[in-house]
Every structure is written in structure tokens, then in C-alpha cells.
Amino acid sequence: MKKLISLFLVLIICCFMCGCGKEEIPSSDVTGTTNIKQGIVSEDFNEKGTGKLKCSQEAVAGEGIDVDLSYLVSYKNGNILELVSIQKVVSSDKSSLDLYENAYRGISKNYDNLKYYDGVVVRDSNSVTYTITINYDKIDIKKLLEIEGEEDNIVKNGKAKLSLWLDLAGKMGTVCEEV
């Protein structure tokens, strides 16, 4: 759970400093979509099959800072096989980018020696992008839990559970659709 908390730490810092807003998306009758007002529920998706979810979360990080959060979740039989998280912060303010870059690098450092957990921070002149790829199908779950802690995480019986991730993501205002 520490990883998930860490992933959202930067967003929370940003929200605390600058406020946070959500764009209300109209409801859809298409299976596999949901809106922020409704929240994500695992029953919206075919957990018993194999599939991919494309998810996004919008955040307002203050004047001159744009934050885009997106996730690609591959799953089979209710278990997450792979999770790709992309967090991109765009700003012309160097000090804001420094704050995000340092936070992302600090988070990523905790996982440096964990095989099948890849965290990459890329900085350019007006953005910082933090991409995390976790192969839950191959990662050593015990080592992952040593880093993250066993309390309040998405792992149950040694597997990363889609329903638990969807519950957590839904609380953060994440919107998903099957792809």
C-alpha cells in the first residue's frame, strides 16, 4: 500500500498546495465506463475474463501547473497482471518541476532493487513524467510487500486484485474504460 500511497503523494502535495478539482463526466450506458460521481465499481468490468483497462484521473494543481494521471491495467480472472502508471506534470515554473522530480525520484529509489518494478523519471524543459510499470504476474510479491507494507494494499492471497485496485482508484476519482 505504501507504493500506492506514494504514487498519490505527489498529487496530494499538489492538491494541498493548490487545490484539487475534478471534471464531471456525463454518465454512459456503455458497459465498462463510469463517471467520477458514480465512482468505479468492480462489477462494471468483466473481472472473470482477460482484458485491459485504460484509466485516467484529472487534477488541478494550481495556476500554471497541469497534472495528467493515466493507468493501463492488464488483468486476467480478477488478478492484475501488469499495471502501468504515467504521471505527467507540465509547468513553466522550474521550482514546481523540481519539487515533482525530487518527489518522484525519492519514491522510485525505494524500488531500485525490485525486479519487475520499473520506475522511470524523465525531465525536460517544461515537464516531469514518472512512468511506473509493475509486472504483478512476475514480481516477488513478498519483497514488494516488505517495501509497501501488508496493511491496506491491493494484494490478497499473493495476487494483486483488480477489485481492490478499482476500489482504491475510485476513491481517488479515477475513471476507467475497457480497451
Map each language-model feature to its residues:
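Surface-exposed, beta-sheet-biased, low-hydrophobicity segments with strongly acidic/polar composition
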Residues: 25-28
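Subset-of-secretome marker
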Residues: 36-179
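Bacterial signal peptide processing site
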Residues: 21-23
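C-terminal motif of bacterial Sec signal peptides marking the signal peptidase cleavage site
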Residues: 15-19
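Intrinsically disordered, low-complexity repeat segments enriched in small/polar residues
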Residues: 6, 34-37
